[in-house]
Amino acid sequence: MEKSIAKGLSDKLYEKRKAAALELEKLVKQCVLEGDYDRIDKIIDELCRDYAYALHQPMARNAGLMGLAATAIALGINDVGRYLRNILPPVLACFGDQNDQVRFYACESLYNIAKIAKGEILVYFNEIFDVLCKISADTENSVRGAAELLDRLIKDIVAERASNYISIVNNGSHGLLPAIKTDPISGDVYQEEYEQDNQLAFSLPKFIPLLTERIYAINPDTRVFLVDWLKVLLNTPGLELISYLPSFLGGLFTFLGDSHKDVRTVTHTLMDSLLHEVDRISKLQTEIKMKRLERLKMLEDKYNNSSTPTKKADGALIAEKKKTLMTALGGLSKPLSMETDDTKLSNTNETDDERHLTSQEQLLDSEATSQEPLRDGEEYIPGQDINLNFPEVITVLVNNLASSEAEIQLIALHWIQVILSISPNVFIPFLSKILSVLLKLLSDSDPHITEIAQLVNGQLLSLCSSYVGKETDGKIAYGPIVNSLTLQFFDSRIDAKIACLDWLILIYHKAPNQILKHNDSMFLTLLKSLSNRDSVLIEKALSLLQSLCSDSNDNYLRQFLQDLLTLFKRDTKLVKTRANFIMRQISSRLSPERVYKVISSILDNYNDTTFVKMMIQILSTNLITSPEMSSLRNKLRTCEDGMFFNSLFKSWCPNPVSVISLCFVAENYELAYTVLQTYANYELKLNDLVQLDILIQLFESPVFTRMRLQLLEQQKHPFLHKCLFGILMIIPQSKAFETLNRRLNSLNIWTSQSYVMNNYIRQRENSNFCDSNSDISQRSVSQSKLHFQELINHFKAVSEEDEYSSDMIRLDHGANNKSLLLGSFLDGIDEDKQEIVTPISPMNEAINEEMESPNDNSSVILKDSGSLPFNRNVSDKLKK
């Protein structure tokens, strides 16, 4: 440069610096006209070395910036592109200067350079975008204002030229190959043709890594800057930014958690636009695919309608039809002019035709629409060949579902909902991860989140339900899904628990082995569900249990009932509140006989006598009162399976009153009387008296209507009378005593007991005594399959063992022993029926203040449960 120009550029006054820049511009223009490019190189080198790179000299850097801008203006649009690689680096370096004035002039200089370079500036877009991203958060208002002007200019250039501008940097006169070529032998001149470099100045694939790095910026101004740029790139035709959606989608979700409302607003708008674009492209590709399938169908129909029978041999006719079909199919990917070229197609080998048909079918069946070389003159629609990477998008969405921000969760759910309707199959590999988060959202406090989560969960359930047939085997990894469901079940609320059971039921129908492999977790899930108070959850759990405990899977039922009894033994509160209901529901869903058989055999192995007595009383009470047990009661009454009665009798021997109740249900009154006589030989405990009191109340229930009518036939049922009178003689005089006594006194007994017995004996000797009802009602136990003596001996053995155990306990604990009151281990209110009836027995009043009366729908339950001492006050009250 001339010294005057150099001095003017370094002047403190802006007017003098501006005048010097104009002189420099004239000088460079003169060099361009004269072709003195060497001097231009020296001027640029001087401006960079001595001025723009002069660190800690703000005035020198300002001079260099003005000089470089003037040089770029002088070079013009035709020549500036070749010098940008030397001009731009020092200008961009000044954006990081500590002096705000230098940063301001850097913005001004780059603005002037970009205004001249236009599309050529796009070659250095990454570097420019990087400095703009940093300067957008500048603390100085003047610098930020200049940066906004520069940013606006770069956006305009990108919007206009990014999708089609090809740089001329490598297409100048320097280094080009000759346009003509002369043949050295003949002397002929030929024109050379070279392939044009079609590489665009702007490269989106090169820009995406930088965007991925910057998208996680924290500064709100930078975030707004990034969102604005993404809008520009998204709306620029031909760039196809949506193809790189997974690269920046995760960063946009972090913007939604920004504390500044303007950041959240612009981000929300951008994400709506992105989702709309995804939806548009997917629908477009689906529409194009359907059109192609329709074209194929039309061609096939045209072939079928045009073919007529000929006199050719069958093999030749089939081959001809096949070649004709190949001709029609070939038209899908060839120009129209080639469709009529029968000669070329007729010479095609049949093996090649088959291979072409196979590839064509694979193309039509593919999920994404692939790009074809020629589309028979069809108009190209932007977006029809874009490949949307849904798996990576879903990964980002699932990660953001676990966010603590409600807005982020809502948008992630909305995206998942839309993509599920577009391409549901891509969610199959992500089911386990999605459900682990989605089930938590079902219990969210925000109703909007819960509502959308329910919809998404329903869509996923429908998706898995639609996977049927061998072709889908192995596509869904049910094992991880089951693990995820069982883990989420215990920490979830009711809605989430119900959803978990819905999934487990579905998986069992699809892949039973996957459920059966997770026995421990399944048992815990079912037990937790049955212990809950929600009716829908219990219904789902029972439905799953019914599926798991199929008729052929007794081992599963046994293991489940073992775990259930273990839970009851460990959780006394659960026994008090839910044991009756749980056992009743399980028996109603499964076969009652099957459940009673299995659970009775399990109780035989328990050493805890008190717990065993509790469970036997629950089973006995349910057998008498539950409507679901009517079939089992009828089976016991008709003695269809004597061995079943025998097994129940032996298992229930630890609880004598329950054994007597069983005999009453089976109408085996002789056996009941014998048991009563046998047990009277041992010391009667308070527990037994309480249960007898309850049994007397149960005699008034509808279940024993038949027994009460049988009291009118004393000659046929003498042991019924003896048993009832025996119970009357055993219990203390109380309200229960008065109730039973009134019932017995209401009978019109006009004969003595001896006459009744003699009449009974004479009737047994009569060969015509074979009435069907009397056979059922009055069976001789000694002649039946119930093995009378064996059962009585077993009962005696159990009673003696229990008597010995009681004596040992009294010796160990002495006078302070507190015996557990059977019948008082449940709460006073049956939570499933919510019915309370006033007590009828002062004996029970001596123990508990209130007691429910039985009905056919609920068990008899004593209130204020707990282990109570049999003290003197109770004894005195019983005596009274």
UniProtKB/Swiss-Prot annotation:
Localization (cell): Vacuole membrane
Stored PANTHER family: PROTEIN VAC14 HOMOLOG, TAX1 BINDING PROTEIN-RELATED
Annotated PROSITE patterns: HEAT_REPEAT (PS50077)
Note: Present with 12388 molecules/cell in log phase SD medium.
Record's bilayer topology term: Peripheral membrane protein
Keyword annotations: Membrane, Phosphoprotein, Protein transport, Repeat, Transport, Vacuole
Residues recorded with modification Phosphoserine: S767, S805, S867
Keyword Membrane carried by entry: yes
HEAT-type repeats, residues: 82-119, 243-280, 388-425, 429-466, 517-554
A cellular component annotation (GO) from this entry: PAS complex
Subunit architecture: Component of the PI(3,5)P2 regulatory complex, composed of ATG18, FIG4, FAB1, VAC14 and VAC7. VAC14 nucleates the assembly of the complex and serves as a scaffold.
Lineage: Eukaryota, Fungi, Dikarya, Ascomycota, Saccharomycotina
Impact when changing R61K: Loss of interaction with ATG18 and VAC7
Domain notes: The N-terminal domain mediates interaction with FAB1 and VAC7 while the C-terminal domain mediates interaction with FIG4.
Stretches with biased composition (Polar residues): 359-372
A GO MF term: protein-macromolecule adaptor activity
Designated gene of the protein: VAC14
InterPro entries referenced in this protein's UniProt entry, alphabetically: ARM-like, ARM-type_fold, HEAT_type_2, Vac14, VAC14_Fig4p-bd
Stretches the record annotates as Disordered: 333-373, 850-880
Primary location class: membrane
Transmembrane residue ranges: none
Entry protein name: Vacuole morphology and inheritance protein 14
Family matches, as SUPFAM superfamilies: ARM repeat (SSF48371)
GO biological process, alphabetically ordered: 1-phosphatidyl-1D-myo-inositol 3,5-bisphosphate metabolic process; cellular hyperosmotic response; phosphatidylinositol biosynthetic process; positive regulation of phosphorylation; protein localization to vacuolar membrane; protein transport; regulation of phosphatidylinositol biosynthetic process
